[in-house]
Every structure is written in C-alpha cells, then in structure tokens.
Regions:
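Periplasmic/extracellular loop-to-transmembrane helix junction in inner-membrane transport proteins
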Residues: 14-27, 49-94
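Short cytoplasmic-facing helical segments at TM-TM junctions of multi-pass membrane proteins
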Residues: 118, 158-203, 227
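Short hydrophobic, aromatic-rich alpha-helical segments embedded in or entering the lipid bilayer
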Residues: 59-69, 73, 212, 222-235
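Transmembrane-helix boundary motif in ABC transporter permease subunits
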Residues: 90-120
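Transmembrane alpha-helical segments of polytopic membrane transport and secretion proteins
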Residues: 1-36, 262-280
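Transmembrane alpha-helices
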Residues: 148, 152, 184-218, 241, ...
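Generic hydrophobic transmembrane alpha-helix motif, especially the helices
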Residues: 121-157, 164-165
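Hydrophobic alpha-helical transmembrane segments of polytopic membrane proteins
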Residues: 227-264
Length: 280
C-alpha cells in the first residue's frame, strides 16, 4: 500500500509543472476558488463604499490597485520587496544548513538526542518576535537582526521534521548498511537523506512559511526597509491602501514560491534522491 502511494506521488512529481497547473486550471476546485475570490472582492468594495469605516481606515480595492501602481512607479515596492526576499532567502538557507544536519544527528543518535532534544524542546516554544530586542542589541537595526529572527524561528520545523524522517526510516535499510559495513558518510548520504527526503522537504516548506510570516513583524521593529517596514510606515501615514498592497505582495510571493518553486524542487529531489528507486 505504501509502495502504491509512493508510485502515485512520483508519477505526479514527474509531470511538468505546466501540465500540473493546466490540470488544476480546469478543475472544479479552481473555478470555485475563482468565484469565491471575485465574490470577496465585490463584498470588499461594497463594505468600503457603505460608510461603515472611515476612508483613512478602510481602503477600496480600486485604491489598493492604485497604490500598487504608484509604489511601483516610485520604486518603493521593488526596493522593499527585494529587501524582504533577500532576508527571507538568507534566513531560510541558514535554517536549512543548520536544521537538516542537526535533525539527522538527533534522529540517528540516541545519545545525541538524549543530550540535546530537551534543550531544543525548551527553546522551540519561544516566539520569534520575542527575540527581536536581543537581536537588535546583538546585531543592530537592519539586515542581520532580521535574518537572525527568521533563522531562529525557521530552524525548528526543518530540524524536527528531519529528525522524524530519520527515526521513522524502515529498519531494514539500517540493517543492510550495518551488515555490509557501509561507511558512515555513505550511510548518511545514500540511506538517511534519501529515506528522510519527504520529511525534509515538508520541513523546508514549513520553515519558509514561518519565516515569511515572522519577517513582517521583524521588519516593522528592526529594519528601515522591507515589506514589513513599508506596511508599518503606511500605518503612520494613514494609508490603508499601501498597507493592503504590501500584504497582498507578501501573499503573492508566498503563493508563487509555495506552489511553483517547492513543487519544482520536490519533483527534482524525489526523482534524484528519494522515491524513484523505491517506485521501481
């Protein structure tokens, strides 16, 4: 049963991205989602014109579109978006570099897990925003402090998911490696990582999502650029249209990366490392 599920997932992953999106585009779910989105925009416009909220607190969709145009023409949208994307990329990259190896060690070694897992579980519940004051003291206001908050918030999902992947690996693979006296590096590279790959990718998805959420709060406090700063600056100027434009930009980038970049990475890594051999 598990092999059938694996084969189905590999078949889906092997499809070209455009083909998968073409199938989604004509699906019933897509049509329902589009209708719901249009209805939401119409309701939004109606509420904005009803007078329930003052104009300086509730922007109309047309005003948000105009905010997109004006901030783009001034270069503010591109500058702040690029600043946030840079911080997000560096923070997620560092979280992956630290989280994957530590997760492998925690999953593969009982002694290492007994020594360090309690500390990880103790620190993990601390919200990333709570680290901003210390990050400012350590790194000052700007790039480094924001990246630190993204890193510290995002390292845990990939770490715990990698550990779960290693601990749930079928014992027969470990037994075969031990019988043939496989070198430790070979065992990690050819057994642990491929076997844990679906968990690692899931952890990276969660890390990206968590980082993209926390970056807004971090930039509001510890940065003078970025989408979070742009949203907070618009608040002081009573510009809800710019605030919503920044929020939509964040949502669009997150959607594109989640549904295009990660799908592409998953397809390549599964074929190269993960389940291709199992499916055969």
């Amino acid at each position: 049963m598990r092999e059938a599920a694996v084969q189905e997932r590999v078949a889906i992953a092997r499809r070209p991205v455009w083909e998968r999106w073409r199938r989604r585009a004509v699906s019933r779910e897509f049509v329902l989602g589009l209708v719901t989105l249009v209805a939401f925009v119409v309701l939004w416009e109606a509420v904005a014109r009803s007078g329930l909220f003052p104009p300086w607190a509730f922007a109309r969709p047309s005003q948000v579109v105009n905010a997109f145009v004006t901030t783009w023409q001034k270069g503010e949208l591109q500058k702040n978006t690029w600043a946030s994307v840079q911080r997000q990329f560096v923070g997620v990259f560092l979280a992956a570099v630290a989280g994957v190896p530590l997760g492998i060690f925690l999953g593969a070694s009982r002694n290492f897990r007994a020594a360090f897992l309690p500390i990880c579980r103790l620190v993990y519940p601390i919200p990333g925003i709570a680290w901003i004051p210390l990050a400012i003291l350590w790194f000052g206001i700007g790039f480094k402090s924001t990246v630190f908050v993204i890193f510290f918030t995002g390292v845990w999902p990939v770490l715990f998911n990698t550990m779960a992947g290693v601990t749930s690996l079928d014992s027969q693979y470990t037994d075969v490696a031990r019988v043939y006296l496989a070198p430790r590096l070979f065992y990690v590279w050819r057994v642990l990582i491929p076997g844990s790959l679906p968990f690692i990718i899931t952890g990276l998805r969660l890390t990206y999502g968590v980082g993209w959420r926390v970056i807004v709060g971090a930039e509001m406090i510890s940065s003078i650029t970025g989408l979070g700063f742009m949203i907070d600056d618009a608040r002081w100027q009573l510009r809800p249209d710019v605030m919503v434009a920044g929020m939509i930009t964040i949502a669009m980038i997150g959607w594109v990366v989640e549904n295009w970049a990660f799908d592409y990475v998953e397809r390549i890594t599964i074929e190269r490392w993960g389940m291709k051999a199992v499916a055969r």
